[in-house]
Amino acid sequence: MPFEFSPLKLVYGGEALGYAEGRTVLVPRALPGERLEVESVRVAKGVVHAKPLRVLEAAPERVSPPCRYFGRCGGCHYQHLDIEHQVAWKSEIVRETLKRIGKIAWEREIAVHQASPWNYRNQAQLKVVQNESGEVALGFFEGESHRLVPIDECLILSPRLNQVLGQLRQPQWLGRLRGCREVELLANEQDNQVRITLFGNFETGEPEPLAGDLLSQVEGVVAVAFCDGQRTRVFGETAFTYRVGEYQYQVSAGAFFQSSRYLLPEFVTAATETAPGDIALDLYAGVGLFTLPLAQRFRQVIGVESHPAAARDLEANVRSHGLKHVRAVGQPASDFLRRFAHKEPDLVILDPPRSGVGKSTLQYLIDLRPRSVHYVACHPPTWARDLACLLSRDYRLEGVEMFDCFPHTYHIECLARLVRQD
């Protein structure tokens, strides 16, 4: 049954939170201060998840979403909110998360870095769905579902990725994607070269003919990779590269790389900026986004990465830049820290996955007693949890920064700078 709802605030996850009849209510595409008519969709752990039916009284910061798929496609969450208020709310969410989860009352400024709000993504994960009649569709899933929304363009993808997407949606290509479950597109920093990675088991035979046709007929495509869960085969340019500042990074199919192109140089500078020293560790290093720039400031740098493809790229990137004082280590951060003998490194950079660092790895890190820790995170809740652990063990929080790398979504990149208190 529909009921009236007035949200109080936005929360991490892209929804608006409020209360009705003593129960917590979460509603997407709603704004604080509005009056809406909503309807319950489900109740989980005592929280009512509802959908908006009508806006009865709109907030002044509400805008008309420019994307015709907004509200169905699960990619964006805030296109109904003007960009200034998006950034303000994200900053408040970072502060509130520190307080609620980390019990950290950060009263000082949160430095905010903003990206251009459109065409900023250099990467897309497109879903492929085949219906009962055998027709293949390409697009994004609806929020919290596996229902496909076929799309012609995405306003947050780079122009080149939109061009490739438009071509792949043509019938001659869709029919050749049977057996594929996901198509990943990655554009380089100039947005003039694209790698297509196809995930799945293909029903159309060997991949060479499809790869050859994609390379020759889709403008901008320079590499095509096929991943079937057992192995990865690459056609075209086997070493796809992405330049950030003065460094060129090899990024293999399956290796993680930042997907927001506009803030990358600023992001790298902020994470690596520190006084010169002897030893720096870059844990969860990926392909070496922070590892290589650290080489300018430290006599010895060690990048640690456990993902096989990313670890190989890390080693290749260190080697290609001739950095003799930089070492690439392919193992989990916890294993490396447990065996690392050099106490008190000058700097440790943490950039873990959404799950965070975790207790045991944090304990190994604390035992190592680094002088400074820069903690980069894409998931504020686990970031705040881990920061609380560090702050309870002789570390002081010196600064907090927020990077709005993904406008119109709830996603946030955070940076915390900590120093050891002797």
Placement of each model-derived feature along the sequence:
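Rossmann-like S-adenosyl-L-methionine
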Residues: 4, 12, 16, 175, ...
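Hydrophobic beta-strand signal
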Residues: 37-39, 125, 281
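Short beta-strand micro-motifs enriched in acidic
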Residues: 39-43, 127-131, 186-190, 419-421
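Extended interfacial segments that mediate partner engagement and assembly in macromolecular machines
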Residues: 53-65, 71-180
